[in-house]
Amino acid sequence: MDRQKEFVLRTLEERDIRFVRLWFTDVLGFLKSVAIAPAELEGAFEEGIGFDGSSIEGFARVSESDTVAHPDPSTFQVLPWATSSGHHHSARMFCDITMPDGSPSWADPRHVLRRQLTKAGELGFSCYVHPEIEFFLLKPGPEDGSVPVPVDNAGYFDQAVHDSALNFRRHAIDALEFMGISVEFSHHEGAPGQQEIDLRFADALSMADNVMTFRYVIKEVALEEGARASFMPKPFGQHPGSAMHTHMSLFEGDVNAFHSADDPLQLSEVGKSFIAGILEHACEISAVTNQWVNSYKRLVQGGEAPTAASWGAANRSALVRVPMYTPHKTSSRRVEVRSPDSACNPYLTFAVLLAAGLRGVEKGYVLGPQAEDNVWDLTPEERRAMGYRELPSSLDSALRAMEASELVAEALGEHVFDFFLRNKRTEWANYRSHVTPYELRTYLSL
């Protein structure tokens, strides 16, 4: 048995852990969990835990549903919730999903991302990610479709006396850091009740695990604080939606492959081609980075979110931004993709972003001129004249672009690609047939 497994088993005994929660994610990004007793973990390390894959969104047909979860000891963390006596009785690990013969499950989002990271490794790169995760903190209420109520009326960077959101963020960060998830900073975002917590850079697979843990922790802490948290992309029509701005960089060993001291923006040819790849394939990957009907209520003109495939230095109206906070710091040269929302599947999102960027690097895509103006203020004609393609404005148009994409099919694999399209086509059809309160208010008098 390797040292990581021995460490986990020893920690369970020393800290008297009573429950080990084995986590994995379905294709749509929902967290799944099975709890086992510590005495069963050594066997789980050796043989895995069998489950019905046909009961998990996108995993398997009922006729071939035997699936196995293998805990990854490198992801072991004690959960931060304690009993009244202060005893932390539960821990968690993420799992890799396989078929009974030991082959990887093509439906496992971790496997989808790992395949892209392997491809990056074959090109000599490792990928690091730093997300800015936004969400809403709401007052308790029924989940019956009624209008939610934010916990406050604060705005961007606001500091209030007896600020419930401030207390919430402090408790959430304590819980995250207890689990070894480093937080860079946190603050109130622009809309009432809207929060942002930024996680410190990590390798892409660890970060996807961290994002899933983050969403779980945030919801748990919100309940403890007498509130509820929502990662819905756009719960309020009159306010900005919740993004997951995704900062990415490629490293060759310890060297940032995106940095060049000779460039005015300190951006290397690798970095430029990576951005060009994101822009070229932006429409194709939108259904993954923004997977819900509601996602496209956020990606609208004036909504503080990108609507065209453009890039710029320090330009927050562009799809891809090159942050310029520390222009001469080699390790910090990165690109920020501003379209993903915080309700995406982080494994699939990082996979398609990496696939698009690597395609640009492999094929030597040439990056066009940067956007120096506010892209939101440009007319459609001006955008076309500048070569900025419009991003999909609905889930339907995003699915059409994805369906024709060889890149996304290759990045996700045939199984996930086909399931995702079928599932999202059903979601769109259900939405189209639904009569909304807006329609009743507007058209009932006809």
UniProtKB/Swiss-Prot annotation:
<dbReference type="GO" id="GO:0004356">
    <property type="term" value="F:glutamine synthetase activity"/>
</dbReference>
<dbReference type="InterPro" id="IPR014746">
    <property type="entry name" value="Gln_synth/guanido_kin_cat_dom"/>
</dbReference>
<dbReference type="InterPro" id="IPR008146">
    <property type="entry name" value="Gln_synth_cat_dom"/>
</dbReference>
<feature type="binding site">
    <location>
        <position position="338"/>
    </location>
    <ligand>
        <name>L-glutamate</name>
    </ligand>
</feature>
<feature type="binding site">
    <location>
        <position position="245"/>
    </location>
    <ligand>
        <name>Mg(2+) 1</name>
    </ligand>
</feature>
<feature type="domain" description="GS beta-grasp">
    <location>
        <begin position="15"/>
        <end position="102"/>
    </location>
</feature>
<feature type="binding site">
    <location>
        <position position="249"/>
    </location>
    <ligand>
        <name>ATP</name>
    </ligand>
</feature>
<feature type="binding site">
    <location>
        <position position="321"/>
    </location>
    <ligand>
        <name>ATP</name>
    </ligand>
</feature>
<keyword id="KW-0547">Nucleotide-binding</keyword>
<dbReference type="GO" id="GO:0050001">
    <property type="term" value="F:D-glutaminase activity"/>
</dbReference>
<keyword id="KW-0436">Ligase</keyword>
<keyword id="KW-0832">Ubl conjugation</keyword>
<dbReference type="GO" id="GO:0005886">
    <property type="term" value="C:plasma membrane"/>
</dbReference>
<keyword id="KW-0963">Cytoplasm</keyword>
<feature type="binding site">
    <location>
        <position position="184"/>
    </location>
    <ligand>
        <name>ATP</name>
    </ligand>
</feature>
<dbReference type="GO" id="GO:0046872">
    <property type="term" value="F:metal ion binding"/>
</dbReference>
<feature type="binding site">
    <location>
        <position position="189"/>
    </location>
    <ligand>
        <name>Mg(2+) 2</name>
    </ligand>
</feature>
<dbReference type="Pfam" id="PF00120">
    <property type="entry name" value="Gln-synt_C"/>
</dbReference>
<feature type="binding site">
    <location>
        <position position="336"/>
    </location>
    <ligand>
        <name>Mg(2+) 1</name>
    </ligand>
</feature>
<feature type="domain" description="GS catalytic">
    <location>
        <begin position="109"/>
        <end position="446"/>
    </location>
</feature>
<comment type="function">
    <text>Glutamine synthetase (GS) is an unusual multitasking protein that functions as an enzyme, a transcription coregulator, and a chaperone in ammonium assimilation and in the regulation of genes involved in nitrogen metabolism. It catalyzes the ATP-dependent biosynthesis of glutamine from glutamate and ammonia. Feedback-inhibited GlnA also interacts with and regulates the activity of the transcriptional regulator TnrA. During nitrogen limitation, TnrA is in its DNA-binding active state and turns on the transcription of genes required for nitrogen assimilation.</text>
</comment>
<feature type="binding site">
    <location>
        <position position="298"/>
    </location>
    <ligand>
        <name>L-glutamate</name>
    </ligand>
</feature>
<feature type="cross-link" description="Isoglutamyl lysine isopeptide (Lys-Gln) (interchain with Q-Cter in protein Pup)">
    <location>
        <position position="363"/>
    </location>
</feature>
<feature type="binding site">
    <location>
        <position position="304"/>
    </location>
    <ligand>
        <name>L-glutamate</name>
    </ligand>
</feature>
<feature type="site" description="Important for inhibition by glutamine">
    <location>
        <position position="61"/>
    </location>
</feature>
<feature type="binding site">
    <location>
        <position position="196"/>
    </location>
    <ligand>
        <name>Mg(2+) 2</name>
    </ligand>
</feature>
<dbReference type="InterPro" id="IPR027303">
    <property type="entry name" value="Gln_synth_gly_rich_site"/>
</dbReference>
<keyword id="KW-1017">Isopeptide bond</keyword>
<dbReference type="InterPro" id="IPR036651">
    <property type="entry name" value="Gln_synt_N_sf"/>
</dbReference>
<comment type="similarity">
    <text>Belongs to the glutamine synthetase family.</text>
</comment>
<keyword id="KW-0067">ATP-binding</keyword>
<feature type="binding site">
    <location>
        <position position="134"/>
    </location>
    <ligand>
        <name>Mg(2+) 2</name>
    </ligand>
</feature>
<dbReference type="GO" id="GO:0005524">
    <property type="term" value="F:ATP binding"/>
</dbReference>
<protein>
    <recommendedName>
        <fullName>Glutamine synthetase</fullName>
        <ecNumber>6.3.1.2</ecNumber>
    </recommendedName>
</protein>
<dbReference type="InterPro" id="IPR008147">
    <property type="entry name" value="Gln_synt_N"/>
</dbReference>
<dbReference type="Pfam" id="PF03951">
    <property type="entry name" value="Gln-synt_N"/>
</dbReference>
<feature type="binding site">
    <location>
        <position position="241"/>
    </location>
    <ligand>
        <name>L-glutamate</name>
    </ligand>
</feature>
<feature type="binding site">
    <location>
        <position position="132"/>
    </location>
    <ligand>
        <name>Mg(2+) 1</name>
    </ligand>
</feature>
<comment type="subunit">
    <text>Oligomer of 12 subunits arranged in the form of two hexagons. In its feedback-inhibited form, interacts with TnrA in order to block its DNA-binding activity.</text>
</comment>
<feature type="binding site">
    <location>
        <begin position="247"/>
        <end position="249"/>
    </location>
    <ligand>
        <name>ATP</name>
    </ligand>
</feature>
<feature type="binding site">
    <location>
        <position position="316"/>
    </location>
    <ligand>
        <name>L-glutamate</name>
    </ligand>
</feature>
<keyword id="KW-0479">Metal-binding</keyword>
